[in-house]
Amino acid sequence: MKYYILQFKFLTPVHFGTAENKKSGNLQSFNCCADTFFSALVTETAALDGELCSRFIEAVQKGGLLFSDFLPYYSGAEEELYVPVPYNCKEKVNPLDLQLSFKELCLQYEALRDHENMAYIRVSGIYDYLHPYESTAKEQEKHDFGWSGVQRRLDFRNGGRAYYVSNYTFAEGAGLYCIVGLDDEALLEGLVKAVELLGLGGIGGRRSSGFGKFVLKGAPQLLSEDCGGDAGMLKVLLENKTSSLQMSLSVLCPVQEQIATVKKGAFSLLKRSGFVYNQNSQNFEKRSSVYMLKAGSCFPERVEGRLLEFTALGVQHAVYRYGKAVYMGLPV
């Protein structure tokens, strides 16, 4: 399988609302899961080319087409690529050393708090993160990928009443990227066209307000060890199937036979729900909710996952939810 990187430069704020955001009180984040991207991609491709859409679905079912979640990148002096912090490391935080001075204790507490709140880590910093006592590397510069905000809107269908929409705006040089695993290179051209079409209408929520519009930042990048930097290291980790710790880079829905392997790992559950458009009633119908394993979940071996297929009341076509994972072998 060959791996490509698609980098997205967002032209407008994004709205990726999840039940997790509401529960935690987080107004908005830039977390766009692979199932959201796949659903949007299939919808756009079906309007563009029904046969191509069927080929995408068939390739995913056979494991020949894989997507990661949208992950952050930052373009500065170097092209920095970030991945989720492994869940098995979040519980292995050293306690505070009460023998230290008050000033040193405060610094240690701040470092501990930053460690607990960290969601993403640069690819080139993974080894140092996993082996903090062996590393002599300097601390990497931290970037703000953007900021959360709230915008006021007027609903003229209901007398011009005001309502508020949370969103996330990316900083200059920051954006999101997606790792695409592909067996059949013949699908790449159609995939790029579908993604470009998707960018015109936007991805995520509140697209009618202009949110989620993006363009591709250059052509798809084929990952190889010759790429150098974060991209070259990412390629090595994606191909590392022998590591005793395999981290998923996308939401995952395992099959029954894989539950035993999942139980040996470290993971967090994420509720996924949504709506599907019913052309007969001209309304959106709520589709079944499902709990999936978040990106960053770690297992002793790679758990393939599956593509879920649902039916919705009044909807004549099948409804899919992506639940397969892209993995990287961690350097433990």
Model regions: which residues?
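Conserved active-site/ligand-binding neighborhood in enzyme cores
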Residues: 1-332
